[in-house]
């Protein structure tokens, strides 16, 4: 059986939806602006979950990144998409009530080593979870709970080892937190 076609929501420059495109073909050298999300998970000790993208990923394979990210389907809320991707990517649950919208206006454009462009309007969420992780090997090569300040230092020292969206999001999350020493940035 053929898996269902996954589509992304295309956006105008002002963020208004203007259509959809097949996810398998939309990421190219001229990727249009589309809707996505990022989610940063924390444990009860205030550590942040970072994941290393599986080597089979089309863009930025093998780099360390945020806990998980994805694209909502047309008509799917960001919160519903986050719950879906938490299960698909990490084998865990994220309670919609535990989600906090941390960076509502985050947007970026980046080009990977193969020339493929990411061009996303990408609200950033955080959540604290207490559930076990069972990551999908198709999505995640490795994962680690990290001290937020140590991660921020690592990203600053070796940005090439991390996804471009993490290198942009993490300092913004840290700044928005009021420089909290632990817990959710």
From Swiss-Prot:
Pathway: Isoprenoid biosynthesis; dimethylallyl diphosphate biosynthesis; dimethylallyl diphosphate from isopentenyl diphosphate: step 1/1. It comes from the Bacteria. GO terms for biological process: dimethylallyl diphosphate biosynthetic process; isoprenoid biosynthetic process. Residues 32-168 form the Nudix hydrolase domain. Binds 1 Mg(2+) ion per subunit. The magnesium ion binds only when substrate is bound. Pfam families: NUDIX. Its cofactor is Mg(2+); Mn(2+). Mn(2+) binds at residues 27, 34, 71, 118, 120. Mg(2+) binds at residues 69, 89. GO terms for cellular component: cytoplasm. It is found in: Cytoplasm. It catalyses: isopentenyl diphosphate = dimethylallyl diphosphate. InterPro entries: Idi_bact, IsopentenylPP_isomerase_typ1, NUDIX_hydrolase-like_dom_sf, NUDIX_hydrolase_dom. It is an enzyme of class 5 (isomerase). The active site is at 69, 120. GO terms for molecular function: isopentenyl-diphosphate delta-isomerase activity; metal ion binding. NCBIfam families: IPP_isom_1, PRK03759.1. Belongs to the IPP isomerase type 1 family. Catalyzes the 1,3-allylic rearrangement of the homoallylic substrate isopentenyl (IPP) to its highly electrophilic allylic isomer, dimethylallyl diphosphate (DMAPP). This is Isopentenyl-diphosphate Delta-isomerase. It comes from Leifsonia xyli subsp. xyli (strain CTCB07).
């Amino acid at each position: 059986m053929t898996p269902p076609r996954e589509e992304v929501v295309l956006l105008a420059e002002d963020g208004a939806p203007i259509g959809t495109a097949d996810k398998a073909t939309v990421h190219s050298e001229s990727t249009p602006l589309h809707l996505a999300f990022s989610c940063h998970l924390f444990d009860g000790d205030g550590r942040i979950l970072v994941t290393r993208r599986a080597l089979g990923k089309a863009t930025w394979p093998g780099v360390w990144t945020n806990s998980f990210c994805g694209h909502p389907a047309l008509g799917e809320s960001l919160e519903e998409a986050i719950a879906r991707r938490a299960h698909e990517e990490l084998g865990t649950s994220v309670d919609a009530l535990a989600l906090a919208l941390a960076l509502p206006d985050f947007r970026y454009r980046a080009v990977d080593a193969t020339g493929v462009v990411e061009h996303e309007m990408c609200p950033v969420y955080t959540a604290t979870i207490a559930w076990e992780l069972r990551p999908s090997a198709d999505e995640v090569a490795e994962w680690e709970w990290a001290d937020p300040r140590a991660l921020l230092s690592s990203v600053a020292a070796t940005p090439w080892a991390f996804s471009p969206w993490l290198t942009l999001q993490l300092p913004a999350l840290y700044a928005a937190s009021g420089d909290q020493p632990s817990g959710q940035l």
